[in-house]
Amino acid sequence: MREHNVTRFIYSSSATVYGIPEKLPLVENMKTGQCTNPYGKTKYMVEEILKDLCSSDEAWSVISLRYFNPVGAHTSGLIGEDPNGIPNNLMPYIAQVSVGKREVLYVYGNDYDTPDGTGVRDYIHIMDLAIGHVKAMIYQKFKNPAGFKAINLGTGKGYSVLEVIHAFEKASGRKIPYKIVDRRPGDISVSYADASLANKELGWRATRNIDDMCIDAWNWQQNNPNGYKC
């Protein structure tokens, strides 16, 4: 990139770099690196490499967008999430249960320190996330800030697993059978963003709520019960 004079870089990072939160909401200047899973560790390591790059060469401008939990689908219903094998994330798993592709949703733990005992996350619609990327590109093009800058992309509101299930039932008109099982190693109880920096620097704010996310995810899934056609 440097050889071809390309020195502006937008990195798809993750809120998992924060690890177990010291306090909430999560703010960009909080300590990172106490990651609870390999995915978060890799995101953290790349951020550290990019920080070193910016420190070694002031020509570089790097924005690290820390995604919270991207879900949903394009509003057209033509583009959606089609994971290989068994989904690792909540929303596509719920969607596959809703169309009968899977029999039951496994809820990992109901003994967290949350109102209903299930884990709470900040879910963000992929369309809001895409707009966040465009805003970051515009910011870099016209302001071209040197150095490394981390920016959260989230709604600032957390929803529990059970709240997401109920929202999807409302969107689909179908009951979602679920079973409570043991916690998964590495899962934390609560995570949600302070997204004020994105609003201040990029002029960005998430506009879609959990109902919108579930409606669009269901629209995609019911039209593509077996995912993309090969």
Which residues make up each language-model segment?
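Short acidic, glycine/proline-rich loop/turn micro-motifs
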Residues: 75-79, 118-119
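Catalytic helix-loop patch of NAD(P)-dependent Rossmann-fold dehydrogenases
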Residues: 3, 7-8, 17-69, 78-89
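Short glycine-/acidic-enriched loop or helix-start segments at secondary-structure transitions
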Residues: 20-22, 74, 162-164
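Structural signature of the Rossmann-like NAD(P)-dependent dehydrogenase/reductase core
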Residues: 9-11, 63-66, 122, 152-154
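C-terminal substrate-binding subdomain of Rossmann-fold SDR/epimerase-dehydratase oxidoreductases
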Residues: 90-230
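Residue(s) in the substrate-gating loop at a strand-loop-helix junction
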Residues: 14
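Feature marks short, surface-exposed loop/turn motifs that line or immediately flank catalytic pockets
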Residues: 18, 71, 157-159
